């Protein structure tokens, strides 16, 4: 996936199109992310004991990763990302793989 937990993203399709938010949770197997405060849905929940009352609860629903675009921390624009290998090596001796912004060519995570 091109985004990780904690990244700031722009929603590019759907009812929240054009809004920005921070990724709260990433689900790589499902290719979905949960963005804080966006894609709010209402769930009708049954009471589950004295600690969890029932009722209509608003919660954030997952969004497919293809519907979000990473906002580059360097240039501040929503842009596509790519992967490249650095000269440095990780703890296993392999080249370190990092994400970079295709608009400004800056490394996103080090």
Swiss-Prot record:
Stored Pfam families: KOW (PF00467), ribosomal_L24 (PF17136)
What CDD domains does this protein map onto? KOW_RPL26
Q: Which GO terms describe its molecular function?
A: rRNA binding; structural constituent of ribosome
Keywords (alphabetical) are: Ribonucleoprotein, Ribosomal protein, RNA-binding, rRNA-binding
The chain's coiled-coil residues are none
- SMART domains, A to Z: KOW
Which example biological process does GO assign this protein? Answer: translation
Q: Give the quaternary structure.
A: Part of the 50S ribosomal subunit.
Protein name, UniProt field: Large ribosomal subunit protein uL24
Tell me what gene encodes this. rplX
């Amino acid at each position: 996936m091109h985004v990780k937990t904690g990244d700031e993203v722009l929603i590019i399709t759907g009812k929240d199109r054009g809004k920005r938010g921070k990724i709260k949770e990433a689900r790589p197997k499902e290719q979905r992310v949960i963005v804080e405060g966006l894609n709010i849905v209402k769930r009708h929940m049954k009471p589950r004991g004295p600690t969890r009352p029932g009722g209509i609860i608003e919660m954030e629903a997952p969004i497919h990763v293809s519907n979000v675009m990473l906002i580059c921390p360097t240039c501040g624009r929503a842009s596509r990302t790519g992967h490249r290998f650095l000269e440095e090596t990780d703890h296993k001796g392999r080249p370190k793989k990092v994400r970079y912004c295709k608009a400004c060519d800056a490394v996103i995570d080090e």
